[in-house]
């Protein structure tokens, strides 16, 4: 029997082998810890992070609201960098809760998945 972490890592590597970010369509990777949420827009061909946002230093609010704010922030930063379309990498997490909030807020902010 595998633990939740082992399951997530197995899914993460399986998906990572199938998707890759390019300069025209970079990968938007989400990492979720118990207290914070981090999002990066990554060009895998050059190995560079094009935009990043996190909930570090934000005012105290419920985690889902924090995730939505981070989604709006990454959409704004990505558009400033000239990025309109991304490949969404949920990093092995279920598409539910905070991960879904980040994705929905980024879509509402103007990013296309």
From Swiss-Prot:
A Gene Ontology cellular-component term: cytosolic large ribosomal subunit
Subunit structure: Part of the 50S ribosomal subunit; part of the 5S rRNA/L5/L18/L25 subcomplex. Contacts the 5S and 23S rRNAs.
GO biological process, one term: translation
Keyword hit for rRNA-binding: yes
Family: Belongs to the universal ribosomal protein uL18 family.
Top-rank taxon, per record: Bacteria
Described function: This is one of the proteins that bind and probably mediate the attachment of the 5S RNA into the large ribosomal subunit, where it forms part of the central protuberance.
GO-annotated molecular function: 5S rRNA binding; structural constituent of ribosome
Cross-referenced InterPro entries: Ribosomal_uL18_bac-type (IPR004389), Ribosomal_uL18_bac/euk (IPR005484)
UniProt xrefs under SUPFAM superfamilies: Translational machinery components
This protein's record includes keyword Ribonucleoprotein: yes
Organism: Phocaeicola vulgatus (strain ATCC 8482 / DSM 1447 / JCM 5826 / CCUG 4940 / NBRC 14291 / NCTC 11154) (Bacteroides vulgatus)
Name of the protein in question: Large ribosomal subunit protein uL18
Keywords (A to Z) from UniProt: Ribonucleoprotein, Ribosomal protein, RNA-binding, rRNA-binding
């Amino acid at each position: 029997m595998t633990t939740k972490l082992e399951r997530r890592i197995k899914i993460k590597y399986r998906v990572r082998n199938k998707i890759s970010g390019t300069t025209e369509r970079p990968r938007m990777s989400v990492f979720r810890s118990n207290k914070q949420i981090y999002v990066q827009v990554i060009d895998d061909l050059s190995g560079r992070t094009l935009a990043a946002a996190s909930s570090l230093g934000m005012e105290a609010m419920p985690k889902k609201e924090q995730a939505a704010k981070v989604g709006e922030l990454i959409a704004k930063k990505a558009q400033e960098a000239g990025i309109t379309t991304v490949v969404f990498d949920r990093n092995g997490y279920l598409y539910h809760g905070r991960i879904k909030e980040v994705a929905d807020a980024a879509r509402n902010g103007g990013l296309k998945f």
